[in-house]
Amino acid sequence: MRSALRIRPLMCAAIAAMACVFSATAQAQQPVCSAWLIESSRFMNVPFGSFMPDRSFVPGSTKPESNIPTVDLPVNIGVIKCGTELIVYDTGWKQQEYLKMTGSDHWAPLPEQLKVLGFNAADVTKVVIGHAHWDHAGQLSDLPNAVLYVQREELKAIEWALNYPEPHIRAVNSDPGGCNRTPACGYMPLTIEEVYGKVLKGKAVIVDGEMEISPGVKIHPAFRAHTAGSQLLEVPTAIGKLVFGSDAFSSYEGIRDWMVANVQQTDSVQQFLAYEKCYKITGGYNNCVAAHEPLSYTDKYPLTKNSWVALNGGRMAELTLAPGEKSRKP
């Protein structure tokens, strides 16, 4: 009996050790992805304080946080290659009246931008939108074979925003498709056609919370961090995990220094919780991929510094490569 009791702890220790080995092996076998960043377009001369209240311009100030009146904001798209899987996170936009009314420049079609990286738009297998606003979900139809991943909460928010009776609150769509600055602004007619075009064609997965869409590639909900159905995308890479945040973290400076950004529809507490989630997943802030950071494609945003100028003055960056993946930088 005593001998059996002595053997049992040894067996338990052996089983635990084997479990650790199997876990480490599984992690080692997890696909490592390559990732790039594409600038869909650029909002020009945006008052810095309207994007980040903590960076509001103060005339005559010598403080670096308050002496910049305007900034140019990129609209960033993530391109992720995991083995044979090609995933796009956010799509930017193509609706020319929307680009014109927002003073945007440096736009180029997403299929042409993908060609610069050596990809075909028809080969994109999955597209995840951080949320369904006009500058993030406007080119879904240009990825004909991609399955859309969108949160159910986001679709519910679209319906609510378009139908709410009080015009100061609902998403007001004015001729020729403009958007008055309401709390629900951003769900534009031509953009909603893009989103529901995928849904109606049976090319959409409606997500409820968290979901793994490919080995190691995980959607995380960030509800109300920008919109009701905001979502993040975790991606395993050779430099650690990346988290693409769309407007849940619009700004690298914001997530680094804990400042809210792009707060038009944002619950600031939920935005900070999205920041925290990226810290927990990646171990810090350097691998958090922001949607509109003015410092994108420069050394001041280190993840994006391996960059170049591409179509129509728009920029691209090679974030990280999987083992054996050749650089696509010209």
Where does each model-flagged region fall?
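N-terminal secretory signal peptides that target proteins for export/translocation
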Residues: 1-7
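Solvent-exposed loop/turn segments at secondary-structure junctions
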Residues: 42-44, 93-96, 132-135, 155-157, ...
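Active-site metal-binding motif and surrounding structural segment of the metallo-beta-lactamase
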Residues: 104-150
